[in-house]
């Protein structure tokens, strides 16, 4: 036991929690904590260039490792700048603890300099928040915060710390709690055995079943159980955008991603299924389209650790509240008692016919660089082993469709909130967590400029990532919608006065490459990967065909079976 100030307790609490890295930006309300980081030691702090980037770095750190990311920001604008990143983590169920400074307790509510109600502002986008009023409460609050962030359905936690409880002259006995008890919070992890048996029996009787896997498989570390279970029952598997990598992308039973830009075979399989085994998903609007037309003949089996997600949008015939890993393990165990399991030959023959539509075909003989070719070439050169972060837009969808992910936690993107500017800082967070891995940020000319200042952070901490900028001089997804829905009226979707991205990256001390011709694509990507392996951050600016659209695309207001497919093109 030690006698410590509040600021020292913050640092010691992080150390006792096992935290090695935090991401932040100093300011008046948290200077005592920053001083303690220096005097106490034991934690590496990454100085970002904008607080939003701090949250995205912590987010990437968390998604790639499963650990809780930690952010430290000052009061007022420091805290509000973090809001977008907190919302991003909340929508995708990512564990994060955000420590925000606050004005002194006596000044709260008096519009003091850099005061804002961080608890009130963040309430809709956090799992829980704490306003700490006593120095001696810091250890127990931090213990609770990390438990809440990572248990049940993970999510972000805010800890708001008034400046006066951090001061050096306020010292108290420090003791890290051995255990905590939160009476109102007791997440269910073990699914009800009766419901599990009923769900398995229903699934095995089905003639047209499909497994629909989401991000909950990844957060529960149950990808291996999913693979074993799916193989044993020979069932087709489709994934949400957040679920990519939960089931091997090149596996024969994988029918690719479903939803707004899902493959023809995935969406048709869902529409015609008689049983949907949904696990670790929340049936968001990008995967269901019109709920009145959604999978009309299917019995829905829904497994999720969050009871509020079950039957929220799609009614579950057999709901199971529990951890995906536990439920799948129990189902695998129960399968041992089954004497005969159908091979679903007729169902697979139907799916193979849908696959022959080749909904991902595109003109590969064009004299312009196609974004699909860029992604496929990257997969070929990296053999699918890289960690890929993505910004939001067409490049995100092209990556999801043309880069098969065979392992979990390799695909890192903002799925729920759709946050542009996420990709670069998230990639830096991944690289910090996994310094020996190849980390690639796939972005566009719109998204990259939202947090491009973090090239400076990358330089300061020698975080070598590859930035692949699919440059179409426009806001590609906005332009696509304008083409399809607004009769081609391109209102403010073209990007004029773009910087020279190669020179810009070089000005930060990095290596830049521009690719303008299809014939040079593979050679220059190989050069970029070579420079990356030598420890350089590499910015690759690829001038792609700006007329290219993402297909398939579901028709607004339609069922899962109603999609726009690419017209056959002439070279």
Curated annotation (Swiss-Prot):
Catalysed reactions listed for this entry: 2 pyruvate + H(+) = (2S)-2-acetolactate + CO2
Signal peptide: none
Disulfide bonds, paired cysteine numbers: none
InterPro entries reported in the protein's UniProt record: Acetolactate_synth_lsu (IPR012846), AHAS_TPP (IPR039368), DHS-like_NAD/FAD-binding_dom (IPR029035), THDP-binding (IPR029061), Thiamin_PyroP_enz_cen_dom (IPR012000), Thiamin_PyroP_enz_TPP-bd_dom (IPR012001), TPP-bd_CS (IPR000399), TPP_enz (IPR045229)
Superkingdom assignment: Bacteria
Gene Ontology molecular functions: acetolactate synthase activity; flavin adenine dinucleotide binding; magnesium ion binding; thiamine pyrophosphate binding
EC number of this enzyme: 2.2.1.6
Residues that hold thiamine diphosphate according to the record: 51
Enzymatic class: transferase
Thiamine pyrophosphate binding: region residues: 394-474
Keyword Amino-acid biosynthesis: yes
Cofactor needs: Mg(2+); thiamine diphosphate
Residues at which Mg(2+) binds: 445, 472
Chain sites annotated for binding FAD: 153, 261-282, 304-323
Keywords from the UniProt entry: Amino-acid biosynthesis, Branched-chain amino acid biosynthesis, FAD, Flavoprotein, Magnesium, Metal-binding, Thiamine pyrophosphate, Transferase
Annotated GO CC locations: acetolactate synthase complex
Pathway(s): Amino-acid biosynthesis; L-isoleucine biosynthesis; L-isoleucine from 2-oxobutanoate: step 1/4; Amino-acid biosynthesis; L-valine biosynthesis; L-valine from pyruvate: step 1/4
Cofactor binding, note field: Binds 1 Mg(2+) ion per subunit.
GO BP term, pick one: L-valine biosynthetic process
Subunit-level organization: Dimer of large and small chains.
Family: Belongs to the TPP enzyme family.
Other notes: Contains 1 molecule of FAD per monomer. The role of this cofactor is not clear considering that the reaction does not involve redox chemistry.
Protein name, entry field: Acetolactate synthase large subunit
């Amino acid at each position: 036991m030690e006698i410590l100030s509040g600021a020292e307790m913050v640092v010691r609490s992080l150390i006792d929690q096992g935290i090695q890295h935090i991401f932040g930006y100093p300011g008046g309300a948290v200077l005592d904590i920053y001083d303690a980081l220096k005097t106490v030691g034991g934690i590496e702090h990454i100085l970002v260039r904008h607080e939003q980037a701090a949250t995205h770095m912590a987010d990437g750190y968390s998604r790639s490792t499963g650990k809780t990311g930690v952010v430290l920001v000052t009061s007022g604008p420091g805290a509000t700048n973090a809001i977008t990143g907190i919302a991003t983590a909340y929508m995708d169920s990512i564990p994060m603890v955000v420590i925000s400074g606050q004005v002194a307790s006596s000044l709260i509510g008096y519009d003091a300099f850099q005061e804002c109600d961080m608890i009130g502002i963040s309430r809709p986008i956090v799992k829980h928040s704490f306003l700490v009023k006593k120095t001696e409460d810091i250890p127990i609050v931090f213990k609770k915060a990390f438990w809440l962030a990572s248990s049940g359905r993970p999510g972000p936690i805010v800890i708001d710390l008034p400046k006066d409880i951090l001061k050096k002259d306020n010292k108290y006995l420090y003791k890290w709690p051995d255990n905590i008890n939160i009476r109102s919070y007791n997440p269910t992890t073990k699914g009800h055995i009766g419901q599990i048996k009923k769900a398995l029996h229903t699934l095995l009787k089905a003639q047209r079943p499909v497994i629909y896997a989401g991000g909950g498989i990844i957060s529960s570390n149950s990808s291996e159980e999913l693979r074993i279970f799916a193989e044993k029952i020979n069932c087709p598997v489709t994934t949400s955008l957040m679920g990519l990598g939960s089931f091997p992308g090149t596996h024969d039973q994988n029918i690719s991603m479903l939803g707004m830009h899902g493959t023809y075979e995935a969406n048709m399989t869902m529409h015609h299924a008689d049983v949907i085994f949904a696990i670790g998903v929340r049936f968001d609007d990008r995967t269901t389209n019109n709920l009145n037309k959604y999978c009309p003949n299917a019995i829905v089996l829904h497994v999720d650790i969050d009871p509020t997600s079950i039957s929220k949008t799609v009614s579950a015939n057999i709901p199971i509240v529990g951890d995906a890993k536990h439920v799948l393990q129990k189902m695998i165990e129960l399968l041992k008692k089954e004497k005969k399991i159908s091979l679903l030959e007729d169902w697979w023959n139907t799916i193979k016919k849908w696959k022959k539509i080749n909904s991902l075909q595109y003109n590969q003989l064009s004299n312009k660089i196609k974004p699909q070719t860029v992604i496929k070439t990257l997969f070929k050169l990296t053999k699918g082993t890289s960690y890929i972060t993505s910004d939001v837009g067409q490049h995100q969808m092209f990556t999801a469709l043309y880069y098969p992910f065979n392992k979990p936690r390799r695909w890192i993107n903002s799925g729920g909130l759709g946050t542009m500017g996420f990709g670069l800082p998230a990639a830096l967070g991944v690289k910090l967590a996994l310094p020996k891995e190849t980390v690639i940020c796939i972005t566009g000319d719109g998204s990259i400029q939202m947090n491009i200042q973090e090239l400076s952070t990358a330089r300061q901490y020698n975080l070598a990532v590859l930035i692949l900028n699919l440059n179409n001089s426009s806001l590609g997804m906005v332009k696509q919608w304008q083409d399809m829905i607004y009769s081609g009226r391109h209102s403010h979707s073209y990007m004029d006065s773009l910087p020279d991205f190669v020179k810009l990256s070089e000005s930060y001390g990095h290596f830049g490459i521009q690719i303008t011709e299809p014939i040079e694509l593979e050679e220059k990507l190989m050069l970029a990967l070579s420079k990356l392996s030598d420890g350089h951050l590499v910015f690759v600016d690829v001038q792609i065909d700006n007329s290219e659209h993402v297909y398939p695309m579901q028709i607004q207001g339609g069922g899962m079976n109603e999609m726009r497919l690419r017209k056959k093109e002439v070279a």
